[in-house]
C-alpha cells in the first residue's frame, strides 16, 4: 500500500471517528450540567424530568450548525470512500477535503456559539456531550488534511509521469 492509499485510508478512518463523535454529541443531552440536572441541544432534564427546550436563537444556530456539520461530514466520508475504492475515478481529493474542512468549520461555529451562550452562567458546567463535539473537531480537520495530501501526491505523480527520469 502506497503513501497515497495510506493517507486516504487514514482520512476515512479519521472522518469516521469525527462523524461518530459529532452524532454522539448532537444526539445526547449532556452538553451542560447543573446541580438540578443536565441539558443538551434538544432537552433539559431537572430532577429526572426531561422537557423540550424553548426556542432560542443562539441554540437554534448551534443545532443547525451541528446537524449541517454531521451531514457535510458524512458526505465527505462517502466521497473519501469512493476515491479510495474507485482507483480510476477522477474524483479529486480537494473536494473531499473541502467538505471535511467545511464540516469542521460548522462544528467550530456551533461549539463557539454554545460556549459564548453558557460560559458566563453560574453553577453551569460543560459535560461530556459538549466535549465530544470538541474532540470531533481535530479528527475532521486531520481527515481533510489526509485527503489533501493524498491529492497533492497524486497531482505530483501525474505531473512527473511524462518525464523520462526514473525517481
UniProtKB/Swiss-Prot annotation:
InterPro entries: PMP-22/EMP/MP20-like, PMP22/EMP/MP20/Claudin, PMP22_EMP_MP20. It is a multi-pass membrane protein. The keyword Secreted does not apply. Coiled coil: none annotated. The chain crosses the membrane at residues 7-27, 59-79, 96-116, 134-154. It is found in: Membrane. Its main location: membrane. This is Claudin domain-containing protein 2.
Amino acid at each position: 500500500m502506497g503513501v497515497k492509499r495510506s493517507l486516504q485510508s487514514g482520512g476515512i478512518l479519521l472522518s469516521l471517528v469525527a462523524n461518530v463523535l459529532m452524532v454522539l454529541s448532537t444526539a445526547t443531552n449532556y452538553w451542560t450540567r447543573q446541580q438540578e440536572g443536565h441539558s443538551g441541544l434538544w432537552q433539559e432534564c431537572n430532577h429526572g424530568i426531561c422537557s423540550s427546550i424553548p426556542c432560542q436563537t443562539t441554540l437554534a444556530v448551534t443545532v443547525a450548525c451541528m446537524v449541517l456539520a454531521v451531514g457535510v461530514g458524512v458526505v465527505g466520508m462517502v466521497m473519501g470512500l469512493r476515491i479510495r475504492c474507485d482507483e480510476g475515478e477522477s474524483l479529486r481529493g480537494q473536494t473531499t477535503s473541502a467538505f471535511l474542512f467545511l464540516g469542521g468549520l460548522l462544528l467550530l461555529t456551533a461549539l463557539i456559539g454554545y460556549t459564548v451562550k453558557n460560559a458566563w452562567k453560574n453553577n453551569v458546567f460543560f459535560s461530556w456531550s459538549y466535549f465530544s463535539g470538541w474532540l470531533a473537531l481535530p479528527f475532521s480537520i486531520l481527515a481533510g488534511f489526509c485527503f489533501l495530501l493524498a491529492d497533492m501526491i497524486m497531482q505530483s505523480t501525474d505531473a512527473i509521469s511524462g518525464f523520462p527520469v526514473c525517481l
